[in-house]
């Protein structure tokens, strides 16, 4: 098997993965992951079923569906007074982890430093390193 890039030598196993493994082994309660313990709202389930039945199975534009970006823009303005252009100021990602690395890659230059305040999500340091920065804890 090909060796991993040297940059990965500074990374450790995910604490979340480690705690999950331990909980599974001893039958404990896993508090390290966010497992929703509630049903999805009926309207969301119905919308998903409708989309599947109507053949909505293609990739969207890479920065998110226009209707969703427009809705986010309206909510940002209504709730926070922030005016943002849904065409140029909003990108929809598959989750916070993707958003975080994409943002850091966009704003960090090699040699920059980032300050990571505790407590922190375990990806902050590795994402900073992958972006060329040195994390300071």
Where does each model-flagged region fall?
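Basic/polar N-terminal segments that are highly enriched at the extreme N-terminus
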Residues: 1-4
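PLP-dependent aminotransferase-like
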Residues: 106-137
């Amino acid at each position: 098997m090909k060796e991993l890039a040297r940059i990965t030598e500074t990374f450790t196993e995910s604490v979340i993965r480690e705690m999950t493994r331990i909980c599974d082994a001893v039958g404990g309660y896993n508090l390290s992951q966010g497992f929703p313990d509630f049903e999805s709202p009926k309207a969301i389930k119905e919308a998903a079923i409708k989309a599947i039945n109507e053949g909505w199975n293609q990739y969207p534009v890479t920065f998110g569906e226009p209707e969703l970006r427009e809705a986010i823009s309206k909510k940002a303005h209504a709730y926070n007074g922030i005016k943002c252009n849904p065409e140029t100021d909003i990108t929809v990602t598959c989750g916070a982890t993707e958003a975080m690395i994409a943002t850091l890659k966009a704003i960090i230059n090699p040699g920059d430093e980032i300050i990571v305040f505790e407590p922190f999500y375990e990806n902050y340091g590795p994402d900073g390193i992958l972006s060329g920065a040195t994390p300071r804890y």
